[in-house]
Amino acid sequence: MQNITDGSFGFDTDILATNLINLSAVLGVLIFFGKGVLSDLLDNRKQRILRTIRNSEELRETAIEQLEKARARLRKVEMEADRFRVNGYAEIEREKLNLINSIYTSLEQFENDKNKTIHFEQQRAINQVQQSVLQQALQGALGTLNSCLNNELHLRTIGATIGMFGSMKAKK
């Protein structure tokens, strides 16, 4: 396009030309029409930012509530764990004492059984010695009797013994 007034100050119909009046007019039109759009864009952006802030605040409050609930549950679980730990230790101590008492009772029983076995073996050894001594004494007495007794003395001893048995039988 050609300027109508070459070399003078005027309005240029070429909107892409860079004179001050054209720029002012373009800026004025942009500001007039763009003001509403820009204002709407800024208001929308402001509303989105405010909504995001409110949502963030709500999420933060929800997170704080959940954190408090989690802390309360943690305290409760820790208290239960402490209670179980204390009860567990008490149960372990009880079981330990029961085991010690059981072992002590078993040891006492083993000691008693050992003493009974020793006493039994001593009695058996004493009985064996007594039987051996008695048998040797009887063999010695029998040997003495056999060497001392003659036939007549033997018959008199048998007769006296039979008489004793006869009188014992008569008394019953």
Curated annotation (Swiss-Prot):
Q: Which GO terms describe its cellular component?
A: chloroplast thylakoid membrane; proton-transporting ATP synthase complex
> Per its UniProt record, what CDD domains does this chain match?
ATP-synt_Fo_b
Q: What is an example of a GO molecular function annotated in this UniProt entry? A: proton-transporting ATP synthase activity, rotational mechanism
Database matches in Pfam families: ATP-synt_B
Q: Subcellular location, in the record's words?
A: Plastid, Chloroplast thylakoid membrane
Q: Does the keyword Cytoplasm apply?
A: no
What coarse category fits the chief subcellular location reported for this protein? plastid
Query: How does the record classify its membrane topology?
Result: Single-pass membrane protein
What's this protein's name? ATP synthase subunit b, chloroplastic
What organism, scientifically named, is this protein from?
A: Pisum sativum
